[in-house]
Amino acid sequence: MGGSDSDSRSRSRNREENKSRSLSSSSARRPSPNHEKKHEHSSEKKKMKRRRSSSSSSSSSSPSPSREKKAKKKKKRREAKKLKREKKKEKKEKKRQKKLALKAERAAALTASVPAPVPEEKPQTYLKTWQSEETKEHGPAMTDEQKAKLSTRRPLTKEEYEARQSVIRRVLDPETGRTRLIRGDGEILEEIVSKERHKDINKQSTRGDGDAFQKRLGISR
């Protein structure tokens, strides 16, 4: 009887130990309520963050109506400024064109009112008239044959030219009193004379030049 009681006691102890072990293991496996609360709180935070990020991304992707209004206002202001600048430019251009037109009209009126200056014909001085007359050639009078040949403009033959050039004439200028040797149609030759004859010729020529000049000026000795 004593052995059976001891066996039953040992068995009951073993059972109790097994139960306590199983309870401790189950309690160890089960998370504590504080830990569960923390886990739930962190999961809620994560969810909130996700929602915020999604809302911020959606707000950034789709512009808000206030921003759109501001952008429209800025656009309108820019357009208004551009229009003002263009109007100012147009006004300036119109003013410039008006000024140019007025200047042109004034210039035209001045030119029309002021007559063009008529150049006055100055009477020629005696010196000029004398010089112009001096330039004229007072050569010998041409014969009818020479005039006819000049009018026909026929080229001379060699014989005709030599025959004409062989003729030497002494021609007197009635105004100056000078005598010249002329060969052919008008080639003036220099006459070789003595010193005394040369002096006489110079005296006569100076006298004749003085008389001719006084006649042109209208002065008489």
UniProtKB/Swiss-Prot annotation:
A Pfam family that the UniProt record links to this protein: SR-25
Record's compositionally biased regions (Basic residues): 69-101
Gene it is expressed from: arl6ip4
Top-level taxon of the source organism: Eukaryota
Main location: nucleus
Annotated Basic and acidic residues bias: 1-20, 33-45, 131-148, 196-214
The name this protein goes by in its record: ADP-ribosylation factor-like protein 6-interacting protein 4
GO biological process terms held by the UniProt record: mRNA processing; RNA splicing
Role of this protein: May be involved in modulating alternative pre-mRNA splicing.
InterPro entries from the UniProt entry: Nucl_RNA-splicing_assoc_SR-25 (IPR019532)
Similarity remark: Belongs to the ARL6IP4 family.
Annotated Low complexity bias: 21-31, 54-65
Localization per record: Nucleus, Nucleolus; Nucleus speckle
Organism: Danio rerio (Zebrafish)
GO CC terms, sorted: nuclear speck; nucleolus
Record region (Disordered): 1-162, 196-221
Sorted UniProt keywords: mRNA processing, mRNA splicing, Nucleus
UniProt keyword Nucleus, yes or no: yes
